[in-house]
């Protein structure tokens, strides 16, 4: 069997990918309506160089495609990028941003030149009432990481494909038998393990993926459930 070759990933890019996960959502309000800003990973066909309008923000330089439409949904006034850009206009625009967005990005202002550093991208979506804008955002890895850590983002939970399953034995206890004892066993025989992993109440421990899990069995609608927990106090049911 040949060795599995894995591509090398820059540690900073790995942090960004882990922080972004399946996507992050930020709720805000604008124009008296509830809205949502969402960042999503790029899909393979979207991996193109940064194109759009470069903006300087509180978290760093960002490049937005369809910036005019997207920024217009982040506050109470529409944004126009046509004509000569004046400082008073951007000051007014920042004052009318949603407070949540202003805390994250303000002050927002155009950058005269594109960022020359290596950038990474993600998809960005804004939904305000029945309006939606889908665009792309590019920034340096450091800036994107700062963006993801500078607000109360909520992780999007992507449902796991039911076709992907992992089978592992559930060990209830351990005991040693000689070959003669094993050969003498008959259906209906009762075995008492010398080392029990579970008690009569269904509580016990399970070793899975090199970690020790506290386990609790339960039944619901004639299905046996196994609840696992570990030191991070998260729970998983199977």
Swiss-Prot record:
Cellular compartment(s): Cell inner membrane
Region (HrcQa-C): 66-238
Membrane topology value: Peripheral membrane protein
Domain of life: Bacteria
Keyword Cell membrane: yes
Keywords, ordered alphabetically: Cell inner membrane, Cell membrane, Membrane, Virulence
Disulfide bond sites: none
GO-annotated cellular components: plasma membrane
Main function: Component of the type III secretion system, which is required for effector protein delivery, parasitism, and pathogenicity. Probably participates in the formation of a C-ring-like assembly along with hrcQb.
Free-text note on domains in this protein's UniProt record: The HrcQa-C domain interacts with the hrcQb C-terminal domain.
Subunit structure comment from the entry: Interacts with hrcQb.
Protein name in UniProt: Type III secretion protein hrcQa
Source organism (scientific name): Pseudomonas syringae pv. tomato (strain ATCC BAA-871 / DC3000)
């Amino acid at each position: 069997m040949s060795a599995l070759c894995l591509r090398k990933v820059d540690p900073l890019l790995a942090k960004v990918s882990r922080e972004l996960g399946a996507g992050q959502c930020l709720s805000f309000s604008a124009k008296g309506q509830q809205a949502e800003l969402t960042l999503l990973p790029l899909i393979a066909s979207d991996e193109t160089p940064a194109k759009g309008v470069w903006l300087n923000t509180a978290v760093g330089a960002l490049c937005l495609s369809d910036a005019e439409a997207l920024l217009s949904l982040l506050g109470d006034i529409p944004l126009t990028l046509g004509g000569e850009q004046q400082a008073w206009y951007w000051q007014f625009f920042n004052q009318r941003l949603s407070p949540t967005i202003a805390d994250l990005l303000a002050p927002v202002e155009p950058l005269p030149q594109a960022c020359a550093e290596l950038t990474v991208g993600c998809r960005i979506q804004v939904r305000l009432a029945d309006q939606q804008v889908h665009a792309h955002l590019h920034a340096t890895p450091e800036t994107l990481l700062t963006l993801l850590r500078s607000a109360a983002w909520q992780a999007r939970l992507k449902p796991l494909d039911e076709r992907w399953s992992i089978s592992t034995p559930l060990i209830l206890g351990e005991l040693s038998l000689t070959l003669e004892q094993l050969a003498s066993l008959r259906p209906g025989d009762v075995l008492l393990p010398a080392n029990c992993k579970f008690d009569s109440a269904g509580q016990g421990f399970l070793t899975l993926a090199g970690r020790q899990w506290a386990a609790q069995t339960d039944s619901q609608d004639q299905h046996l459930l196994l609840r696992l927990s570990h030191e991070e106090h998260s729970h998983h049911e199977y």
